[in-house]
């Protein structure tokens, strides 16, 4: 499965199949959340939140790829990510793109 954020894959003719997406909502353990609150007071990277967002992007991408595979896709083009806070310490990540088949 080829994943790109462009509307083409070099050297391939594409047949559009469908839009595909994946999403997840992730949160951190309350103990880690409290540690991150203190971290905002002194500055620096919020590693627990950074790790949470990286994990969320990976899960959402996996779900999008699984949806594309069910369609028989060879790739996904025009991939875009979006995220939003749904509550304190929890975030939703959604990824979407266009599933394509090589002609």
Predicted regions and their residues:
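N-terminal presequence-like segments and the immediate start of the first folded domain
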Residues: 1-32, 70-74, 93-103
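Short, solvent-exposed loop/turn elements at beta->coil junctions and helix N-caps
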Residues: 6-9, 81-86
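Short, well-ordered alpha-helical segments
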Residues: 20, 25, 33-80
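Membrane-proximal amphipathic alpha-helices
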Residues: 86, 91-92
């Amino acid at each position: 499965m080829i994943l790109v954020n462009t509307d083409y894959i070099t050297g391939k003719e594409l047949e559009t199949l469908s839009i595909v997406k994946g999403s997840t909502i992730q949160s951190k353990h309350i103990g880690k959340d409290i540690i991150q609150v203190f971290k905002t007071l002194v500055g620096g990277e919020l590693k627990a939140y950074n790790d949470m967002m990286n994990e969320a992007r990976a899960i959402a991408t996996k779900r999008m790829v699984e949806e594309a595979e069910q369609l028989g896709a060879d790739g996904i083009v025009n991939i875009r990510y979006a995220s939003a806070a749904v509550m304190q310490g929890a975030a939703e990540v959604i990824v979407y793109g266009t599933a394509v088949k090589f002609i």
